[in-house]
Amino acid sequence: MIKKTLNKNKKKTSLKNKIIKKSNQDFSALKKYLRVVNFIAAAQLYLKDNFFLERELRSEDIKTRLLGHWGGATGVNFLLSHLNFYLKENQKTNPKLRDIIFLLGPGHAFPALQANLFLEKTLSFYFDNQDKNIKNIYDFNLSYNKEGLTHLIKNFGSPAGFPTHASPVTPGAILEGGELGYSISNASGAVMDNK
């Protein structure tokens, strides 16, 4: 009897250790992802050259006109990375999680959303599958590589590049906002619509 109990405890401990090991690996990957999206968001906001810090930063590498808010971007990145992690882990067991709508209130935190869309490869998929008219307007490479990331960072907030807020060319965007009030009223409407 004692031997059976010891074997059961060993099996439980082994399973517990496997779960802890997997959780630690997932958490480590999540932390790395968060650092990368924060870097991409910061680079979009502040850098006009030397995007990969291949040499020391110089004053001419910094944008003279800043469009966006770094403080909002870090919060959005934290929320999106953890939400995506949670959804990835739980959508199979809870199909209702597929109905989540993400509303971005602080419009000037758009570089964070755009960084996440790039890393999850949504931007490249979206622009590769657009009709000819959209491709003529946004004629640049958004491949999931160094060249694509360079285009993303360099063209943020430029006249022929990416807007500084979510817009109709943002994958998944249903309307353009910029202030917290818009997202609160849209969230209220979505809840009332889905009673």
Residue ranges and their predicted role:
Residues 49, 53-195:
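Cofactor-binding active-site loop characterized by glycine-rich and histidine/acidic residues
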Residues 2-69:
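Cofactor-/ligand-binding subdomain signature composed of acidic, glycine-rich
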